[in-house]
Amino acid sequence: ERIGRLPVLAIAIGIFAAMSAACIFAWGPASLIAFRFLQGIGTGGEVPVASAYVNELSGARKRGRFFLLYELLFLVGLTAAGAIGYLMVPKLGWQSMFIVGMVPVALVVPLRFFLSESPRWLINRGRFAEADKVICRLENSAIRHGQELPEPKPTAAVLVQPKPAGSVKEMFGPLYGPRTLLLWAMWFGAYMINNGLLTWLPTLYRTVFDLPVDQAIGYGFAMTGIALVASFICAMTIDKVGRRRWYTGALLFASIPLSTLYVLGASTPIMVFALATPAFAALQTVTYSLYLYSGELYPTRLRSLGAGLGSAWLRAGSIAGPWVIGLVMSGGSIAPVFLTFAAVAALTGLVVLRWAPETSGKALEELSP
């Protein structure tokens, strides 16, 4: 919020790549954990700032599609990382994956010289001439590629003046406080279930149902592949359906197959796969689009901060998921785990239904003054 989107992106990518290189030369578990922790700082800085940047460059009418097709690359990258690790690690060792992790450093130079700073951030900092140059450059590029520029829509007059970077205190003010709590509930609930399922189901297939390793891995790849298709459908339709309606429907829908697993006893691997997969896919459309919604519910001065603090609840939910699984399974049965996840999905869906504002088709300044 203080020095700009692109400088922070360059720094974060540099930290990530440098710590990838350091991990190659780790001399023990403690040093590897320390380097991975520092690498996580790079990732944690890059993702919310990049999401704010893309949000601020998106037009109101198709912002959801534009942003989520960008976010889809993240899911493709996760799938590709698993495939690359499967192929490389047995032959080249675990260090080879950190060599791959150094590749993003190649983005730093083009990032600084071929991309423009967010015009919304420039305006917010009072750098109007620079913002005008960026906007003119974008308009000229669109015209060169044969695109027609839509007529500007009339909006209420807004006094444009430089504003200081936002603060955590403002995030809990009268306007943004309820939005902050809503987003934190969504981040926590959706990621608690999805990351819980993602990490637990392969172990479940192996230890409870005694499936061969290759079959358990195959179930996992199939589940993530179906979730990838669901995410693409979400990207193409969320602007028409609307954020509030999509999130409510996805969360409440996910609770149905999860609760069905409890009722039926989750007694076979086919049953678990057939019912957990649609729930996971529905929730995946929520988790991967929350950076979009977070960026829409905060103004420019709070956008990166809000997304960053919101994603901290992503980590909290991801930690809570396996812990809840262990706690609930202490009775010896796996079925109550699915009931617990169903209850969390339903409760989060009702929270969204009651308190989530609709943002589709509206300019960011209209949504968050």
Question: At which residue positions do the language-model features occur?
Answer:
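Transmembrane-helix signature of 12-pass secondary carriers
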Residues: E1-P369
